């Protein structure tokens, strides 16, 4: 290689190096391209809903009658000691009936409490106007011991429940009205000494006992509407011989329906325990006052 060729080669190398240099200083750091995008990005999944808030615990309901007394009741079938086996039936047979008395009322025993012939069995000697007879809690008297045969009570028993009115009538002299629990017709009244029967269109039968029979507000065969007055609470009662029998001032209330204890047994038309049906009706009455 000649000297001229060496000079030209050196010049070319110098020009190539100059072209690669960055004018003004340092070479910048390379830019990070970041993660590569996937070829087939996944679709976002469904958004998980927030868990449901737990239902609030309902507040306990306290109901009071017109005198400010708090309503309460002993469980169905839980009778006074020494008064009978009771009948455990929580069925509300007629949820829409009206309570059969216009005013406040107290369900409890007329025989095994103060004023009753067997009150001494529970240390309740005294007369029927004893204050505790006219207070809560209610207590069931269906299947209370009696000599009468009753399909619900294998040993015989009380066919309905006993309801004291708001006040003790011999002491207060007040009038307390019994009313129709449903629309219906008064049946079998002629010749009846102490019972008024109300039958509904579907055959359900109610019996009201011990009303003041010579001052009834209804007649035999009369159609009545729910809430219509039937008669005044009293103590009319007679034995099978027609003799007057003493009893306390109260309404004895019965309900007859087709009843079968299970699916294998044919139903019979007989008394059913109205206690829980009346509890339901009374609670509705207190809420509406």
Identify what each model region corresponds to.
Residues 1-8:
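Bacterial N-terminal signal peptides that target proteins for export
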Residues 9-13:
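Hydrophobic alpha-helical targeting segments used for export or membrane insertion
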Residues 18-19:
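C-terminal motif of bacterial Sec signal peptides marking the signal peptidase cleavage site
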Residues 23-54:
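Ser/Thr-rich, Pro/Gly/Ala-heavy low-complexity intrinsically disordered linkers and tails
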Residues 54-194, 226, 282-289:
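Surface-exposed, glycine-biased beta-strand/turn segments
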Residues 156-158, 172-220, 238-250:
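Zn2+-dependent peptidoglycan hydrolase active-site motif and core
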Residues 199, 222-289:
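Conserved, short, structured surface segments that act as functional micro-motifs
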């Amino acid at each position: 290689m000649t000297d001229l060729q060496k000079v030209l080669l050196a010049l070319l190398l110098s020009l190539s190096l100059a072209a690669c240099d960055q004018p003004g200083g340092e070479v910048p750091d390379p830019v990070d391209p970041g993660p590569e995008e996937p070829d087939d990005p996944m679709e976002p999944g469904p958004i998980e809903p927030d868990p449901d808030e737990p239902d609030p615990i309902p507040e306990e309901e306290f109901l009071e009658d017109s005198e400010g007394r708090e309503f309460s009741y002993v469980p169905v079938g839980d009778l006074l000691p020494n008064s009978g086996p009771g009948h455990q039936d929580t069925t509300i047979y007629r949820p829409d009936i009206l309570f059969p008395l216009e005013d406040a009322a107290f369900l409890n025993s007329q025989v095994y409490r103060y004023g009753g012939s067997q009150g001494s069995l529970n240390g309740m000697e005294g007369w029927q106007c004893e204050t505790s007879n006219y207070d809560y809690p209610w207590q069931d008297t269906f299947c209370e011991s009696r000599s009468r045969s009753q399909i619900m009570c294998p040993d015989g028993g009380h066919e309905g429940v006993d309801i004291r009115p708001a006040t003790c009538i011999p002491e207060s002299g007040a009038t307390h009205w019994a009313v129709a629990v449903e629309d219906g017709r008064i049946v079998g009244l002629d010749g009846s000494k102490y019972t008024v029967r109300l039958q509904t269109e579907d055959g359900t039968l109610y019996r009201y006992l011990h009303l003041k029979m010579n001052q009834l507000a209804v007649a035999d065969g009369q159609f009545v509407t729910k809430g219509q007055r039937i008669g005044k609470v009293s103590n009319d009662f007679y034995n099978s011989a027609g003799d007057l029998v003493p009893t306390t001032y109260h309404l004895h209330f019965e309900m007859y329906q087709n009843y079968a204890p299970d699916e294998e047994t044919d139903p019979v038309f007989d008394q059913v325990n109205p206690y829980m049906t009346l509890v339901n009706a009374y609670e509705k009455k207190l809420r509406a006052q």
